[in-house]
Amino acid sequence: MKIAIFGASGKTGILTVYQALDKGHQVTAFARNASSVTITHKNIGIIQGNILDYEKVKQAVEGQDAIISALGINKLGKNTILSDGTGNILRAMEECQVKRFICMSAAGILKNDAGFFFGKIIIPLILRQVYEDKIRQMELIKQSHVEWIIIRPTGLTDAPKTGSYKITAGNPVSSRIPRADVADFMLKLLTNKQYDGQLPAISS
């Protein structure tokens, strides 16, 4: 399958790229800094660009079978990069007639799905503006005409891939999940349509 991965230079994104190549996919890795994607493989193409640059986004989307977004925000404070960037992806998908979109978000975007400490203390006091943009991103995707799945991982760790994780419709089972397992789940969703139009939580 031909897939574009946005956020390819991030910790979860780069793991998704590696695993996708291992599974035989043809990957277009979209990264703000191409030098941070140090992979040599016959099935990878790298596009350096800003997610807010629509023409660059469209270049990455055109000709793909599916799109994976592992975009993240690396700074606190008011920010619209997720919603604006995702808007560019969705616009390009519709123009290029690419239907399938798997998006990584986070536990906490739905009411009461992040647990008391994180949901009632950390998000409101520290991450409020970050989560406001994640919610804007979610609403854009839900209003789109693509085949979408938004996954809600809990706290991401750098532990090795286990291949064993819990998927729930509501609250996640635990507070942690290896990034490598999140990557594994997103790649499975390329062909597994069980969760289409849903927001499954993933946790260990």
Q: What residue spans do the PLM features occupy?
A:
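Conserved Rossmann-fold cofactor-binding substructure of NAD(P)-dependent oxidoreductases
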Residues: G45-Q64
